[in-house]
Amino acid sequence: MSQNQETRGFQSEVKQLLQLMIHSLYSNKEIFLRELISNASDAADKLRFKALSNPALYEGDGDLRVRVSFDADKGTITISDNGIGMTREQVIDHLGTIAKSGTKEFLTALGQDQAKNSQLIGQFGVGFYSAFIVADKVTVKTRAAGEEADKAVLWESAGEGEYSVADIEKKSRGTDVILHLCEDEKEFLNEWRLREIIGKYSDHIGLPVEMLTKEYDDEGKECGEKWEKINKSDALWTRSKNDVSDEEYKAFYKHLSHDFADPVTWAHNKVEGNQAYTSLLYVPAKAPWDLFNREHKHGLKLYVQRVFIMDDAEQFMPNYLRFMRGLIDSNDLPLNVSREILQDNKITAALRKALTKRSLQMLEKLAKDDAEKYLQFWKEFGLVLKEGPTEDFANKETVAKLLRFASTHNDGSEQAVSLEDYILRMKEGQKAIYYITADSYVAAKNSPHLELFNKKGIEVLLLSDRIDEWMLSYLTEFDGKQLQSITKADLDLGDLADKESETQKQQDEAFGSFIERVKNLLGERVKTVRLTHNLTDTPAVVSTDNDQMTTQMAKLFAAAGQPVPEVKYTFELNPEHHLVKKVADIADETEFADWVELLLEQAMLAERGSLENPAAFIKRINKLLG
């Protein structure tokens, strides 16, 4: 008999997610069983952990398991566990709302592409709500460990706008999830179909999955029923990697991550000695929707002596490897370990160092063995990996080898060139790795600063991600070669520089008074004015000194709301260009000023992508064209 019944409305995000799931995951509908068994496994893990300090929570029943049964006449499937269970408050919190930061942004990001929706929802972790893919009504009966039998809770919903919650009596600890299947989903009311799904997705979770099966006598007559364990229920990571197939590794990854796609690669290692631990690390194929959400925890599952301790233990991986999935099982950490203890712990620091090294080795091997697959990985996670040089000095060179860039060597914008590739193609006498940063690939590719390099056939890396400038402030050299921006006023080409010709000397002398006129006109608005022989098709450019903040870094600071120091540019004019020659011959000071301002504005526009006063620029063009 239920008491204290109330009807409540779903959080708006839940309603939206339910509708998206029902329409987007139809082709993957069997995952409902994987998700519900995974939830049951989590409930068992949480009970084991809490019972370490309070064994009475087992209530005399320490054999944890999940049971799957069906009733063909009633059209129901029941998934039962004897794990931690839930209180009334927890039921409302967990089943009526989605307590995930960034949920609204995630739902907004979903478009009409069903394949994309399916993938994104899988990454989000649909969990309990996947039940509504196959059921038109879901009933949950649950009692939290340690609570009295009359403190159990009944939750019911048809997956629409609301749900009901009431108090009931339940003798056994744990949770029963009863699915009332839709009329066209009766295929799941079949023992062998359910066995197939459990074998596919849940064979290697560390919890026995049992099904109620019929027993037959010697004459083949049905004589009863019994609970039969139908999965291996061993902790896959405890087995020798030689005994685990690729398909088993892939299935375990999907259980662990709730991902639909296979991982790109994985590494399973057992380490003995001063520190004994086992790690199973995976590189996903697709970036999760919340990869750049700083509020969301990203990390490994932590086990101590095969006992689950916590999800998302971020202390074992640097932030730039937050896309890694997997687990670590340590023999050296205490069973009562907490996030606070992990924060300042020598064992944690040593494990983090080892797991970071192992992860980078996985990526190095992938890049070496399958360049195409690595480039697919790079498209998904390259932006995150670029954070590496800014936060991991010890592994900076290793991370640098894994970076990929667009380059003038290739036609397209694909980031496919490594620093090692670049060095192999360097010109004889070239001492630096040259690069340019810009707002976009197109802006970088068409920068006037490239003209001399294109003329000489010197490769330049084209960088257009927002993080690039920040990364390069830490990554200043690679393999003994300096990384040098080609937009700097004091650019040194070393042995590749042209010897100053007699013609250039004559030009410097002939344009001397012109340069002084420009300096006097612009005054403090620029750092200095000078001639340049590094341009071919462009009349003028602006550049910064080595000790000055670059344009892109200034933009980065401004976007982050940080104070930006004033950037004073060097204004460089091309004496070979017909416009510069024309301006140099203008005697009228007003006309001369208009043309100089126009050349400066053009140069600033090419460098910064915008002007402080675009209206004045347009007015000046119209005036000079008229």
Curated annotation (Swiss-Prot):
<dbReference type="Pfam" id="PF00183">
    <property type="entry name" value="HSP90"/>
</dbReference>
<feature type="region of interest" description="A; substrate-binding">
    <location>
        <begin position="1"/>
        <end position="339"/>
    </location>
</feature>
<dbReference type="InterPro" id="IPR020568">
    <property type="entry name" value="Ribosomal_Su5_D2-typ_SF"/>
</dbReference>
<comment type="similarity">
    <text>Belongs to the heat shock protein 90 family.</text>
</comment>
<dbReference type="InterPro" id="IPR020575">
    <property type="entry name" value="Hsp90_N"/>
</dbReference>
<dbReference type="GO" id="GO:0140662">
    <property type="term" value="F:ATP-dependent protein folding chaperone"/>
</dbReference>
<comment type="function">
    <text>Molecular chaperone. Has ATPase activity.</text>
</comment>
<dbReference type="Pfam" id="PF13589">
    <property type="entry name" value="HATPase_c_3"/>
</dbReference>
<dbReference type="InterPro" id="IPR019805">
    <property type="entry name" value="Heat_shock_protein_90_CS"/>
</dbReference>
<dbReference type="GO" id="GO:0016887">
    <property type="term" value="F:ATP hydrolysis activity"/>
</dbReference>
<keyword id="KW-0547">Nucleotide-binding</keyword>
<dbReference type="InterPro" id="IPR001404">
    <property type="entry name" value="Hsp90_fam"/>
</dbReference>
<feature type="region of interest" description="B">
    <location>
        <begin position="340"/>
        <end position="555"/>
    </location>
</feature>
<keyword id="KW-0143">Chaperone</keyword>
<dbReference type="GO" id="GO:0005524">
    <property type="term" value="F:ATP binding"/>
</dbReference>
<feature type="region of interest" description="C">
    <location>
        <begin position="556"/>
        <end position="626"/>
    </location>
</feature>
<dbReference type="InterPro" id="IPR036890">
    <property type="entry name" value="HATPase_C_sf"/>
</dbReference>
<protein>
    <recommendedName>
        <fullName>Chaperone protein HtpG</fullName>
    </recommendedName>
</protein>
<keyword id="KW-0067">ATP-binding</keyword>
<dbReference type="InterPro" id="IPR037196">
    <property type="entry name" value="HSP90_C"/>
</dbReference>
<comment type="subunit">
    <text>Homodimer.</text>
</comment>
<dbReference type="GO" id="GO:0005737">
    <property type="term" value="C:cytoplasm"/>
</dbReference>
<dbReference type="GO" id="GO:0051082">
    <property type="term" value="F:unfolded protein binding"/>
</dbReference>
<keyword id="KW-0963">Cytoplasm</keyword>
<keyword id="KW-0346">Stress response</keyword>
